[in-house]
Structure formats: structure tokens, C-alpha cells
Amino acid sequence: MAVVTMKQLLDSGAHFGHQTRRWNPKMKRFIFTDRNGIYIIDLQQTLTYIDKAYEFVKETVAHGGTVLFVGTKKQAQESIAEEATRVGMPYVNQRWLGGMLTNFSTVHKRLQRLKELEAMEQTGGFEGRTKKEILMLTREKNKLERSLGGIRDMQKVPSAVWVVDTNKEHIAVGEARKLGIPVIAILDTNCDPDVVDYPIPGNDDAIRSAALLTKVIASAVAEGLQARAGQGSGEKPAEGAEPLAEWEQELLAGATAGAADASAEGAAAPESSTDAS
């Protein structure tokens, strides 16, 4: 069965690019035509590239890898958090903090601080402190939760990064490339395909398009988790694959049950990316 259908892509508005005056010439090969001053993306190519990205993500996770989901624009925040959480992967859907990948040792210390503050709050560690001290500690915890909550369980840099809008997330993309971490991303008509290892030509501004493609990537993760656990067709886990952690085993049932949801997207009015900045 196809990972996603042409109809689903059309219904989500994935074929609408930016206005013809706002484009990156490097994207020419992915453009089918232009209509009323708006580029139309070649969805036949999109389907092909989706299959390549899906297979890469599935194999990466099957061999013990993790995928970091990144999308801080308003249209992507909800689906990024929802889909990453569904399959137990880290995500960033608020502001990207410089050095999240290239200076991960420092970021990891901040994560430890977040867990320390949460433990203090839950075990009565705030007792005996002044109201001002409690307020300051609570504010610190909330700030860390907002900026780092999505990567709280990330113990090392990810094996790959999924990005919605490479232009907006250029710092994240740059850090990934600097470390040699493969980038999978939606490529709108104003993006640079040279900075992405596994591109998926499509509309990165429409909520439904971003959600559909993010769900596809999450479903690939779910299938990879299933393969890692040695389930699916009953085969043994791939050689060299890491065993599932306990928390991953708990997530597996729910994650794999939702893996087919990407093919159940309902029809919706298409959204173009012309109104987005």
C-alpha cells in the first residue's frame, strides 16, 4: 500500500508553492507549472521522494537511531509535537536555541537542571523557601520546559532531523549539516534543495500539508520501532540494531497502531503558501 496517495496530497494543498516572484531557481526541477502567479509543485515527484524519505527514516530507527522533529512556525507546532510524541521522538516546536546540536553537552546540562527542578517540585523540595525563591524557581522551570521540554529525554544528538520550513529553521539545518546529521525536510518553492539530504517537495506553509507529511515521517518511525523490536513479519531484529528501551516498548503499541493514520486524512480545502512570510 502506498505511504500516501496523490489525493491526500492534493487535499492537503501540498502542491501549492509560493508566488512566482518568490522562488529559489534551484527548485525549478520540482515545479510542474505556474497558475495565477503561483508555482504548482510536481506531486508525482513528491510521491517518489516521500518513498525515499520513508525508507530512510524506517531503516534509521530500525537500527537504533532517533529522529528529531523540528518545526517552530505556527502552522507546524501542533503536528510536530503531536506526531513526535506519538512515536516517542524528541522535538522542537518553540524557538530553536543556537547550539542545540553543536553544543549539546551544554544543552544536556540544562536538561538535567529541568529534571532537578521538576523533582524538587514533586517531592516537596520547594518547602521552607520564601515565596520569592519559589516564584523564581518556578519561572526557571517553566522557561526550561518551554524551550527544552520536547527534547527532555534526548541523551545524544539525533541520527536524523525532520524539518518543516528549512528557511525558518536555517540554524537547525546548519547545525545538522555541520555535524553530518542527515536532514529530511519539506521543500517549498522558495527553499534551497542543496541543504537537504532527503527532500520532499511540497507546501511547508499550509497546516494540513505540514501535518500530513509530518505524520508520514512519524509513521516511518513507528514502522522502524516495530522492526527494531523484531515484530512485524516475525523476523529477527536487524543485525547491529539496539534493543528497544522500556519506554519505547510501552510506546510501541500505540505508535504502530497509528502508523496507518496518514492514509486516513480527510478531504479539506487546499491552502496555498502565498500568504505566509
From Swiss-Prot:
Write out the biased-composition intervals (Low complexity).
253-269
In this chain, the stretch annotated as Disordered covers: 227-277
What GO biological process, any one, is recorded here?
translation
Q: Which UniProt keywords apply?
A: Ribonucleoprotein, Ribosomal protein
| Membrane spanning stretches | none
Keyword Repeat applies: no
Q: Name one Pfam family in it.
A: Ribosomal_S2
Please provide, in alphabetical order, the Gene Ontology terms of the cellular component aspect for this entry: cytosolic small ribosomal subunit
SUPFAM superfamilies listed in its UniProt record: Ribosomal protein S2
At the top level, the lineage of the source is Bacteria
Q: Which GO terms describe its molecular function?
A: structural constituent of ribosome
User: PROSITE patterns, alphabetically?
Assistant: RIBOSOMAL_S2_1
Q: Which family does it belong to?
A: Belongs to the universal ribosomal protein uS2 family.
Q: Which NCBIfam families match?
A: rpsB_bact
Question: Would you tell me the protein name for this molecule?
Answer: Small ribosomal subunit protein uS2
List the source organism: Mycolicibacterium smegmatis (strain ATCC 700084 / mc(2)155)
